[in-house]
Amino acid sequence: NIGWHALILATGAQERFLPFPGWTLPHVMGPGGLQLLVRSGWPVAGQRVVVAGTGPLLLDTALYLTRHGARVTDILEQAPRRALWSLAVRLARLAPATVWRALGVPRSRLRRRVRPGCWPVAAHGTDRVESVTVTDGSRTWTRDCDYLACAFGLVPSLQWPLLLGCRIEAEAVWVDAWQRTSLPRVYCAGEATGIAGVDCAVVQGEIAGLAAAGQEKAAERLFGARARQQRLAEALQKTFQLRRELLTLATDETVICRCEDV
């Protein structure tokens, strides 16, 4: 047993998967999952990879895989082009450093590979994925690939908060201004309280740590920084909200739960 005066939960997030025909084929996985495999030494040099879904993680994954020799043929972002341009304008005001980092990506690479307003509708193959069918809502086409890295954003990891009995609201852990949960002396920080990115998670962690140590006045001085990061998170959530078509990709034959084969 480990005794404690205060408990701070920082359980993070996990990738959101939406079922579509062929999504259980080998070599169809989340972008974050494929990155973890590559970090562990999994070879992807020369392999054709389609990265698909929504959110900033797609581009990060594509650049990471490219640096390790993979041939990223497409980056399919389901958000429409106009939403991405609107986000870029807002980021220039809220987080200019983020825009400069994005501008550091070779423009020719972006032009060739990023496809806004597109999403996968089916993966095909026998022993592993061999191709993916893509649509932009009006036409469809097929791309050959060795890997399909696909996830539709992130969702809070709530297993531990649920086991402890923390109050959950809007699919995230409820916290007050000092990151306190509904349970006495239990705090929560980061993506478990809502997807807001690493910078917001760091500030939330500092607030939770100070509050747990009884330094609430010091924690209050970080409220402004947290509010700025949360405004940025709201802009990202609005941009990358899922289109309705993604919820109807599964057919009667599509396996919804691969563990139970349902």
Q: What name fits each language-model region?
A:
Residues 66-159, 167-170:
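A Rossmann-like FAD-binding core segment of flavoenzymes
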Residues 29-38, 121, 128, 147-196:
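FAD-site-proximal beta/loop scaffold in flavoenzymes
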Residues 13-50, 54-61, 169-178:
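Glycine-rich dinucleotide-binding loop and its adjacent helix/turn
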Residues 245-262:
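C-terminal accessory/binding modules appended to enzymatic or scaffolding proteins
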Residues 189-225:
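A conserved FAD-binding loop/helix module that cradles the flavin
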Residues 218-250:
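Long, charged amphipathic helices and adjacent flexible linkers at domain junctions
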Residues 11-23, 154-165:
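Flavin (primarily FAD) binding-site architecture
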Residues 2-12, 144-153:
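Short hydrophobic core segments
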